[in-house]
Amino acid sequence: YVHHAWIYGLQEGKIFLEGVYPEAMHCFIYAMNVLFGIPVYSSLLFLGEIHTSAFLIAIYCLLREVMKSQYTVYLVLTAFLTVDVMCVDEIYGISRLQYTIPQEFGLYTEFLCAMYLIRFMRKKQDSKEKKDDMFLFTMALASSLAIHFYVTIMAFFLCGSFAVFGIRKIFQKKNFGKLIAAVIAAVVISTIPMVLAFATGTPLQGSLNWGMNIINGTDTKEGRTQVAQSINDESSMDEAARKLLESSSE
């Protein structure tokens, strides 16, 4: 298990064992082991249920911020958890929530980003609560980027979908300047270790190719089917060649 190996790499003092990659989840599990003696294997085995709970709670908090009735929130969450949609991509996405992997570990942060952005826009200028919300928005954004780049991309689109309804407040001079400063601070906080590692010669981790596949449109249900079909065809050809060789030797 690749993430298991990276965490043990941290224990051995080898940061970014297989290249530069957001390692906030790995550092969290490593810290749990060092501070509390929780075995790395146990964290990997059971943390999925915990971060899934945090994910659902974050969704609840965001929906409570934008919906008047708490029962509507319960209805939305119930539908999300129970409606059976026969779609391979959706089934695959839900199944990933049970695993301890960085993208799913950080999903809760995107909902916190949106929630604190909404709160920031609603509060009066220069109030203590507004400053607190801006700080928490910055920390949520920094956490998303330190955990997984794709979580930050999702947070951007989620925040944008709510910002559309308060576009005038977004571009007010005081608000816009603070938001830009918050985003810059979040990027600096989360990327300094990765930038320094890359600048000192550590290569990027190879899984960035996944992002390129998404951009190219090959990481789809059809694309995965084509890959599986090509592998099956290659296996069939290998089997046919083996039988031909066996018959020739006879």
Report the location of each language-model feature.
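Membrane-embedded transmembrane-helix bundle of lipid-linked glycan/lipid transferases
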Residues: Y1-E250
